[in-house]
């Protein structure tokens, strides 16, 4: 029987201490096992900012899977990769596995204001 892995993104409204910055993610991304999932994070000129991605499974704390746009922490599989350009940052998960089912959050670090959103 075929099954589908559901990768959920959330609509994020992030507020800094001085200005507001809105990040938009799709409500959900659904792919078949073995295929490639791409989860986007949209924001005005997001390519000029540093983007981090977190994976959160039910009942667990978030886990950092990509930082500074495209770097992976130790222990995160190479199947997880990131890119960031223009108004869109993207988390790509290659060869999706059942264990990848989770919520995925993007976080932006604006170096000009020196605090996260």
Curated annotation (Swiss-Prot):
The keyword Transferase is assigned to this record: no
Name of the protein in question: Immunoglobulin lambda variable 3-21
Pfam families, sorted: V-set (PF07686)
SUPFAM superfamilies the record matches: Immunoglobulin (SSF48726)
Residue span, Ig-like domain: 18-117
Highest rank taxon of the organism: Eukaryota
Region (Framework-1) location: 20-41
Encoding gene per record: IGLV3-21
GO annotation terms (biological process): adaptive immune response; immune response
Key words of the record: Adaptive immunity, Cell membrane, Disulfide bond, Immunity, Immunoglobulin, Immunoglobulin domain, Membrane, Secreted, Signal
Record note on quaternary structure: Immunoglobulins are composed of two identical heavy chains and two identical light chains; disulfide-linked.
Region (Complementarity-determining-2): 68-70
InterPro entries, per the entry: Ig-like_dom (IPR007110), Ig-like_dom_sf (IPR036179), Ig-like_fold (IPR013783), Ig_sub (IPR003599), Ig_V-set (IPR013106), IgV_Light_Chain (IPR050150)
Sequence segments annotated as region (Framework-3): 71-106
Region (Complementarity-determining-1): 42-50
Signal peptide: 1-17
Protein's cellular compartments: Secreted; Cell membrane
Primary localisation category: secreted
């Amino acid at each position: 029987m075929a099954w589908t892995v559901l990768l959920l993104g959330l609509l994020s409204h992030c507020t800094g201490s001085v200005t507001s910055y809105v990040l938009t993610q799709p409500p959900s991304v659904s792919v078949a096992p073995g295929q490639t999932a791409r989860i986007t994070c949209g924001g005005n000129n997001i390519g000029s900012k540093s983007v981090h991605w977190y994976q959160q499974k039910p009942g667990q704390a978030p886990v950092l899977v990509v930082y500074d746009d495209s770097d992976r922490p130790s222990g995160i599989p190479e199947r997880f990769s990131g890119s960031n350009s223009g108004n869109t940052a993207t988390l790509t998960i290659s060869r999706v596995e059942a264990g990848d089912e989770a919520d995925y959050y993007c976080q932006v670090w604006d170096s000009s204001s020196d605090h996260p959103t």
